[in-house]
Amino acid sequence: VLRNDPMGRVACETCVTNGLVVVMGEITTSSYVDVPGIVRATLQKAGYVDAAYGIDAKSCGVSVSIQEQSSDISAGVSRALEVRDRDRSDGHHQDLDATGAGDQGMMVGFACNETPELMPLTVSLSHKLVSQLSLVRKEGVLDYLRPDGKSQVTVEYRYGLPHRVNTVVIAAQHGPQVSNEQLA
């Protein structure tokens, strides 16, 4: 959306289960978006090419339920309610205060200067781990790995700064023939 419409807005969720992808939410854009094509290409790129992996990019069902963003949310995103109220009373506002927010608020991280990616160290490390996990799978280093993988990194902070990595968890989908000893 943003490539073709820099002012576009997307508030969508994706649910994936065996053989089915559901994309739902709200989009405001002047451009066309081939959602089923994007879903299939993303699954293919991630390595979901066999129903034995839980989903096959070529044969899975793709259900799309997307509507235009509501006018209330659109107005809130365009200009914060507080700014709209203040503009009516005194006509002045700070640019940073003018930005509104939509109705979704699940967060994994936040912008900060802990890393070059401007994300918390926990998020940056997790992203690097799952990128390496994906590379190892795609290059066949561990031929039993399947596409689903995730990580969580816990960092201890002291005085607001990262002090040490406390815990690293990596979960990787794998074939049923792999023993626990092989995974350890």
Q: Where is each model-derived feature located?
A:
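Short, N-terminal intrinsically disordered low-complexity segments that are rich in Pro/Gly
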Residues: 1-3, 25, 118
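N-terminal, positively charged regions that mediate nucleic acid binding
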Residues: 1-11
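Active-site-surrounding "flap" and adjacent substrate/cofactor-binding loops of secreted or lumenal enzymes
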Residues: 29-43
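Short, charge-patterned binding micro-sites
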Residues: 10-29
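Glycine-rich, mobile lid/loop segments that gate access to catalytic sites or pores
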Residues: 18-20, 37, 44-184
